[in-house]
Amino acid sequence: MLYMIGLGLGDAKDITVKGLEVVRRCSRVYLETYTSVLTVGKEVLEEFYERKLILADREEVEQEADNILKDADISDVAFLVVGDPFGATTHSDLILRATKLGIPYRVIHNASIMNAVGCCGLQLYKFGETVSIVFWTDTWRPESFFDKVKKNRQNGMHTLCLLDIKVKEQSLENLIKGRKIYEPPRYMSVNQAAQQLLEIVQNQRIRGEEPAVTEETLCVGLARVGAEDQKIAAGTLQQMSTVDLGGPLHSLIITGGSLHPLEMEMLSLFTIPENSSEAQSIGGL
């Protein structure tokens, strides 16, 4: 059987009891490494799980899935995912492949950023469509996701922005030349995402458009949600462009405009100080 097991968001101990029991009896255990990361390394997980882990990067999962599914019809294989197993379409594809091969599967869920963002006090049922913000390059600066942000705000809905992760990525030159040389990992921060959003706002004004988001739009930055050093900051988009929330992983919420009094009271716990020097490093659980 193929087991898809969510690991939660914090550290090794965030796996469920059910998930841990399954991991310890599986013949092979894969750890997906490209859609998210935990705050602890592979060795810490192996020690707690009492099992050796096989790292599965994007290429392994998307192009060589048969290796993962090998013998899963006669033995138990675990595929571990940070957060919840269905946080990426790749994982659904793995289940479809297993089903076509006659391999049974079972999913063991866990917390993901999609529901854990409620820790900032914004009500989950008031979130609209989630968007992804990717690292811009000199030749690729996508803005199309901003239409979804606009639609959400028109409907009074908050927008969760998932920020880019670059793990085991090749440069264009190495990709063209077929060289297996990979760039250092990069994780987009809240301030980087806010800076790109501010540029989109300016671009829209230059084109004569009325931007759905401005420098004064209320936003919430979150870092390492679920970890002991989790941080949350609430402030304007302009303030988000300079706030320092520390190491990865980060997420950004663009509020829908009209807030419930309880939402406003909760966000007041995380408000960025007016003093810019104090606003550089924000805490708060």
UniProtKB/Swiss-Prot annotation:
CDD domains: DHP5_DphB
Chain positions recorded as S-adenosyl-L-methionine binding sites: 9, 84, 87, 112-113, 163, 225, 250
Molecular functions per Gene Ontology: diphthine methyl ester synthase activity
Keywords: Methyltransferase, Phosphoprotein, S-adenosyl-L-methionine, Transferase
SUPFAM superfamilies referenced in this protein's UniProt entry, alphabetically: Tetrapyrrole methylase
EC number: 2.1.1.314
Catalysed reaction equations from the record: 2-[(3S)-amino-3-carboxypropyl]-L-histidyl-[translation elongation factor 2] + 4 S-adenosyl-L-methionine = diphthine methyl ester-[translation elongation factor 2] + 4 S-adenosyl-L-homocysteine + 3 H(+)
An example Gene Ontology biological process: methylation
Name the record gives this protein: Diphthine methyl ester synthase
The organism's taxonomic lineage, starting at the top: Eukaryota, Metazoa, Chordata, Craniata, Vertebrata
Keyword Calcium found: no
Pathway(s) served: Protein modification; peptidyl-diphthamide biosynthesis
Family from the record: Belongs to the diphthine synthase family.
GO CC term, one of those recorded: cytosol
Function per UniProt: S-adenosyl-L-methionine-dependent methyltransferase that catalyzes four methylations of the modified target histidine residue in translation elongation factor 2 (EF-2), to form an intermediate called diphthine methyl ester. The four successive methylation reactions represent the second step of diphthamide biosynthesis.
InterPro entries xref list: 4pyrrol_Mease, 4pyrrol_Methylase_sf, 4pyrrole_Mease_sub1, 4pyrrole_Mease_sub2, Dphthn_synthase
Modified sites of kind Phosphoserine: 171
